[in-house]
């Protein structure tokens, strides 16, 4: 099973069950009365981070997933069954984005962290819920609310402190294998690393997670090669190690290699080039006379950038590890300990209640070429779906809701007269007064 770190899917919470009209017939209730139960609530769609989950493969071919809908109400005041929640486990490091608004909804950075992505619809009331001193035998009931539905992307961004970037075959995999217990595939050809490799590096009773990212090539940010696909995994890193090979077989000019990688990082995201970065020259064992190192060091010195030199193959790493840990501590002191969170527009948690969402929705009225008045209003749509037009009591209640919206007054202001036709929700109505 290959790495699947991105997928798109629509999730729909369960609809609320419908209330019903029923009457009590028990022997000890001689006067009977309403007995229709309420519908059950629809199940929620819940996302939960799980450290045992490391891929989105199980969602790759899922286009639409549903939570269970609530059951309808039953006689004898029986409540409909509530729908079961749909719980989806995702890897720690998963970011959830609303594809319709491009807004980040949730960023999972802790094990067992959970988030209700879609709220289930509320169950409709049965006629027993409408009983009152002035309405002892109501012929009223409601349909359940629709569950919330969202089209989202799920994207894994690994929780690594340090990301290692560079051209293919610069020695990134060798470096992480010498620093940690990671066992990446190592060979003397390009694109040996096909997926990100994580390793834990320890120093003075502290530890950091390093990530070896597949090699970048020119125009990687525009889709060339493999590395661009995995650049998302270093968005959370506090520090980047920019590894440059001194072997002339790998690049003609190490200075040009530095600039090309920096351009690709910049084109992908300005956040990457603003991160703390250590530029490291590798394969010093090949640069026997040191001319390539001196050329690169002078070039970077003119930019005010220090250059470290190592030979990962010979484990000549100098004080690189100490420098990385010192820079990490400095970064934490500057930016705080909430290190793995991505910048979010807002951490939005939905509270789904359809009626309240539509209370302040504007009423739009337009007249067509036939003289009919077309009315659009989310709040009115909500009540047309909510109140079935099957009993006189329900029709009267719907009429009251229409008056509350103020549709009659606004139609008069627009110039509507008695006998004009109103078109709403696919139905036509005639103005009688």
Curated annotation (Swiss-Prot):
Q: Name one Pfam family in it.
A: MMR_HSR1
Any single Gene Ontology cellular-component annotation: cytoplasm
Q: Where in the cell is it found?
A: Cytoplasm
OCT domain location is: 355-433
Record EC number: 3.6.5.-
Q: Which family does it belong to?
A: Belongs to the TRAFAC class OBG-HflX-like GTPase superfamily. OBG GTPase family.
Question: By what name is this protein known?
Answer: GTPase Obg
Query: To which species is this protein native?
Result: Mycoplasma pneumoniae (strain ATCC 29342 / M129 / Subtype 1) (Mycoplasmoides pneumoniae)
Q: What is the lineage of its organism?
A: Bacteria, Bacillati, Mycoplasmatota, Mycoplasmoidales, Mycoplasmoidaceae
State the encoding gene. Answer: obg
């Amino acid at each position: 099973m290959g790495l699947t770190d991105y997928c798109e899917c629509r999730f729909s919470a369960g609809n609320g069950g419908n209330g019903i009209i029923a009457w009590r017939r028990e022997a000890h209730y001689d006067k009977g009365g309403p007995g229709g139960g309420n519908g059950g609530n629809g199940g929620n769609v819940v996302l939960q981070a799980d450290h045992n989950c490391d891929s989105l493969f199980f969602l790759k071919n899922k286009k639409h997933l549903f939570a269970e809908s609530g059951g309808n109400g039953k006689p004898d005041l029986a409540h409909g069954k509530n729908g079961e929640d749909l719980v989806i486990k995702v890897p720690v490091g998963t970011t959830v984005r609303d594809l319709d608004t491009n807004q980040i909804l949730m960023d999972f950075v802790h094990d067992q962290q959970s988030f209700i992505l879609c709220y289930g619809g509320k169950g409709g009331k049965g006629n027993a819920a409408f009983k009152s001193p002035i309405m002892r035998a109501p012929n009223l009931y409601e349909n359940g609310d629709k569950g919330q539905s969202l089209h989202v992307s799920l994207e894994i961004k690994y929780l690594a402190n340090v990301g290692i970037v560079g051209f293919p075959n610069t020695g990134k995999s060798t470096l992480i294998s010498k620093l940690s217990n990671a066992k990446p595939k190592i060979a003397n050809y390009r694109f040996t690393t096909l997926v990100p490799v994580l390793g834990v590096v320890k120093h003075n009773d502290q530890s950091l997670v390093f990530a070896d990212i597949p090699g970048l090539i020119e125009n990687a940010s525009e889709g060339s090669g493999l590395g661009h696909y995995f650049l998302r995994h270093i968005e959370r890193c506090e520090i980047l190690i920019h590894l440059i090979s001194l072997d002339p077989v790998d690049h003609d000019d190490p200075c040009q290699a530095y600039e090309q990688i920096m351009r690709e990082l910049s084109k992908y995201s300005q956040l990457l080039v603003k991160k703390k970065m250590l530029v490291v020259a590798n394969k010093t064992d090949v640069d026997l006379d040191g001319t390539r190192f001196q050329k690169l060091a002078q070039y970077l010195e003119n930019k005010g950038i220090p250059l470290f030199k190592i030979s990962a193959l010979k484990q000549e790493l100098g004080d690189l590890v100490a420098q990385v840990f010192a820079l990490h501590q400095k970064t934490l002191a500057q930016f705080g300990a909430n290190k793995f969170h991505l910048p979010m527009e807002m951490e939005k948690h939905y509270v789904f209640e359809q009626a309240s969402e539509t209370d302040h929705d504007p009423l739009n009225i337009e007249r067509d070429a036939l003289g009919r008045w077309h009315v659009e209003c989310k709040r009115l749509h909500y009540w047309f779906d909510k109140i079935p037009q099957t009993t006189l009591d329900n029709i009267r209640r719907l009429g009251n809701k229409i008056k509350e919206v103020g549709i009659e007054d606004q139609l008069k202001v627009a110039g509507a007269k008695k006998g004009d036709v109103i078109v709403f929700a696919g139905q036509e109505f005639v103005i009688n007064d």
